[in-house]
């Protein structure tokens, strides 16, 4: 079965979802509709040329209200009300909600009213039927999960790591700091913002702010609910982020054991989700890396046998966009 998906919101994540599908060559998913309030030609241009990820790897043709990237015409609309979208006409299996605006179950469920069989939100979504981190809990998807959250890029980085470590050595409590590239909701110059930290110029500051990513791990791993917390430090890089995770293990462990646990999982049941490196790499080396999380082995530290610090990189755009497709395909198997 080839799952038919639509994308509402053709921004950083929306465009990268389409690009990831085309670059992967996978044939189990196809984009049949895009809704974005920008002009079709502008959306096509931003798809062709990308400052972070480079030129689109295929031709991008515009014909009236369609974009074609080699898999047939994709219908493009500019409809404000999600209930009025053409998902029934396009026979959409999974509507991908990528605007950042309709990030609650009630708001996202308007895609169901428009004819989509399921909805996948590219952000944490209050009230979602299930929050999924692919590779960690996607097996829990059932036909009753109509509105699903794909969590956040940071939760997708931390959750696989937390799962395997908790399974092997146990986590009493842990604290995460994500050193995170700036994103589209941050200004280029100081301006008004509901978060006064994020009101400051993105490219000129290191900005401490909040994140619910660590607590959200408890939504996908109930055994860790209430045991994790975290903060975010937004930094002046345009892409790639890193999770610095410190925790108290429930039993004594070592650097070697922690690294072996991660390496084994990355070569086994978390292959293509969790990667690892023992090279002296920096953030730009992980640009366009499709893993949810890439563990940096030579950064592991253990103090007094049970206080552990680990570091894991993630391309906060590309890895997450690849997981959106993976999760959509998993959802389609429940329809």
Which role does the model predict for each range below?
Residues 1-199, 326, 334-335:
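N-terminal Rossmann-like NAD(P) cofactor-binding subdomain of oxidoreductases
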Residues 4-6, 147-149, 243-249, 308-314:
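Short glycine-rich or small-residue beta-strand-to-loop segments that form or flank ligand, phosphate
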Residues 20, 259-261, 323-327:
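Composition- and surface-driven signal marking solvent-exposed, interaction-prone regions
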Residues 23-86, 170-173, 178-307:
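C-terminal substrate-binding/catalytic lobe of Rossmann-fold NAD(P)-dependent oxidoreductases
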Residues 100, 153, 209, 250, ...:
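Structured loop/turn residues at secondary-structure junctions
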Residues 156, 252-253, 318-319:
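A generic structural signal for alpha-helix starts
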Residues 290-335:
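NAD(P)-dependent Rossmann-like dehydrogenase/reductase catalytic/cofactor-binding core
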């Amino acid at each position: 079965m080839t799952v038919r998906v639509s994308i509402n919101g053709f921004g950083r994540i929306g465009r990268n979802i389409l690009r990831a599908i085309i670059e992967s060559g996978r044939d189990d998913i196809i984009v049949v509709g895009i809704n974005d309030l920008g002009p079709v030609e502008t959306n096509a241009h931003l798809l062709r040329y990308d400052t972070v990820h480079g030129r689109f790897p295929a031709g991008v043709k515009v014909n009236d209200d369609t974009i074609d990237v080699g898999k047939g015409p994709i219908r493009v609309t500019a409809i404000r009300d999600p209930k009025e979208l053409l998902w029934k006409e396009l026979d959409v299996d999974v509507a991908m909600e990528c605007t950042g605006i309709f990030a609650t179950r009630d708001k996202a469920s308007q895609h169901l009213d428009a004819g989509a069989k399921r909805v996948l939100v590219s952000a944490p979504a209050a009230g979602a039927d299930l929050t999924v981190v692919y590779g960690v809990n996607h097996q829990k998807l059932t036909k009753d999960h109509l509105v699903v959250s794909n969590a956040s890029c940071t939760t997708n980085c931390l959750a696989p790591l937390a799962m395997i470590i908790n399974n092997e050595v146990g986590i009493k409590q842990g604290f995460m700091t994500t050193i995170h590239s700036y994103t589209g909701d941050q200004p280029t110059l100081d301006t008004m913002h509901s978060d006064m930290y994020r009101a400051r110029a993105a490219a000129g500051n290191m900005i401490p702010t909040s994140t619910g990513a660590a607590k959200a791990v408890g939504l996908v791993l109930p055994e860790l609910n209430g045991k994790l917390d975290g903060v975010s430090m937004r930094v002046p890089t345009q892409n790639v982020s890193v999770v610095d995770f410190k925790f108290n293990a429930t039993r004594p462990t070592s650097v070697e054991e922690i690294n072996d646990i991660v390496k084994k999982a990355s070569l086994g049941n978390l292959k293509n989700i969790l990667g690892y490196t023992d090279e002296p790499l920096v953030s730009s080396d992980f640009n366009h890396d499709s893993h949810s999380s890439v563990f940096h082995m030579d950064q592991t530290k253990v103090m007094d046998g049970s206080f552990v610090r680990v570091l894991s990189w993630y391309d906060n755009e590309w890895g997450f966009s690849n997981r959106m497709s993976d999760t959509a395909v998993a959802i389609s198997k429940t329809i």
